[in-house]
């Protein structure tokens, strides 16, 4: 395996040496000799790689070759950079002062000659220990295996291919959670690769489970979890999104109290995926109260994690797949059938395939990975070779994994890595940077790969970095080595992660190759992958980092800080100490996002990192960017979205970075900052471009742009904007914010003629959409704000047949009527309408928006009624806020047979009476009525809302009476009902009620007598003024004596 990785490095060095001849004037002889030596060296790699396991000396030779290649890249690249700098006119004095600016040809001749001498020595050493030379004709050749693997066509992955032989298991687990009231904790245990997480996901997403529980939470626990993080994740999942910031600021004690109260008063399912030790469960467990509304589903390799000798704990051990199911799963992946009727498998392949899957032992992960490998191999010869390799691995018994039970699976997973092309090996090893269960941002990952030189020139030359990254991720996904799915709206891989066992392979291979070193603040001694200094260093969850004291390797190529997303929500940051980067001058990648810098100033020595390709300062606390940043001419990624309250000073040096592909500018650079960006013609992403600091003319040449966010000032005309961006025909995402839009009353609009555009956000004055002014037909997401459209936009927008999400935000439409025509919006799934001050009438024709599932209308105060008919029948969630509907909306809404969640909030209905007819709302699960100031009477007829399990009524000051019924109701909260005086609970009403909370209802004198017949009630919260009468010996104690938990506030 090291042979291919080294071959990859030799190829990169060869490419450097094969640049323009004039660059190497004065050292031509040394360069020619080095190329010849590299060619000779490559001929020994295959045999050296095979013998390194049996000879320590050969292994040391292989390590020395890696160092030679790294040093060669550093030497040659530095020479080329200095040559180019020497040719540049007008070089700043500060750059001249750098020791490396004036090329010393004699010094480099000696350096390159030294590389040749080291290669000659290592070849002699290998030959003396029997390493054989292979014949290589001509110049450096890429390994043939890489070429063959790249030429093979790609196949799309069948999303259902993993789900074989699990149906009975899912049914049994759902039964434990839904039907068996005494079961509290269900654990799925077994060896790695058995499909425990896949099984848990199927259960988690099961319709019966969603219907049974009010709240669902999924937490990946992993080995290095903290109790605080797990508790925060659970509470965030169970609470509204608006409360995330508040949750992240809670102390551990407050978190525990909130979770106990919540789990006492609601039915929740918590999935804890990948718990390693019994002690981990004991740490998490204190949030679960003795009441039984909650349930836990956990997965673990350790059967003892949640074992208890009582019936409330169930341990479920899935069986390995049968031979028949194993073959079915294997066929779906390795031999996808285009036409099952005509498909006939090659007999030899069938025999070899069935032989190989025996080695997988019925483990789904091993079968999927084996299938992914063989899907890439067409000939029976390839299949036979792989079958022999698997057999030799098993017979040889060589492994570094600890768990003997998993050896079979680990052999197959390890072999899947060995079968990768060399460039994909690097891509896969790079994933070792990230913690367990980390959702890796594929776009950022693509730029890491590009900055490290992992992209192959034939893939990278002229291509968009994001596109190449997507191709590489797709190849790893297709081989079942990485888990990811394409986003519905963007059609891209947005995030990816590793299966826990595949991550073990990744960490093991990274350790074997000394690929990187990991240091984590969560461990007392760090988690170093190698005692040997690595060229890559990653800090996970740092608190402080001193670049002068903590980093000792001047040859370091990559320094990355990694933290989970939840840390960002909690305002996490860390302190970067040390003022000099001088000792790190060979860095290619520097990611110090969220760093606090002393005095808010980035050290000027950053400019000496002339090899740097990737610099991430996102959300770092920086107020000044030094002029020396202009020295970083090789940068392809620069993120300056700084986290400071005021403006950030950015000198006019970005124009020097002509290799930039990604640039995110600070949101506020002050009026004095003026940037020239016309040289940055390779940009693919440009964010926070403002005409206050930049010229629109500079955009004309950026024809490679895919993502652009732009802010206009009042002195900028829309004609100028249109002329500047009109040629950016490859744009996929565009955001325009016009801060001077109301000054442009006489200007024409913009024609958005971008055929590849998928996401468009417009925050600008645009009163008319002319016939010529159309939107791109491939749009999937559209946000409009401050447009003040005078005419109904729906006739134009509904013709966007790919549109999946539409938001009409504040002041986007100033007219009174909107009409959604029959057949319009065929793919729209989510519609949000907010802040339309003049909108009064909404008509929806039959068959409009046929797949719409979410509707949110807020702050549309003149909208008096919903469409009488033809609201999309597939709606599952509706939220109305401050709409002032005059007519009762229930007769319209109750006909929506798929509706599961309904919120009528803050004056969304101004009438006195609401009536829910019998048989209405057949699937409604949750209903919230809040701040309906005029509501006096709410009538619910028998048979209405038969599935309702959560009802919340708040701040309805005139409501005097509550309806009866609700046969499935489990949670009821009544808050600030000022006129509510009497409550009658009839016999048989609310037979499943579990939690009841009554707050601030001053006229209600006592609890209803019928409450004593609701034996399912477990939690009751009532006013403190009732404490005496409800306590033991009190006059109403008989009403509550059967309730386990009664709280008084």
Curated annotation (Swiss-Prot):
Binding site for ATP: 190-197
Gene Ontology terms: biological process: defense response to other organism
Region of interest (Disordered), residue spans: 139-158
GO MF, one annotated term: ATP binding
Domain of life: Eukaryota
Domain writeup: The LRR repeats probably act as specificity determinant of pathogen recognition.
Protein name: Probable disease resistance protein RF9
Gene responsible for this protein: RF9
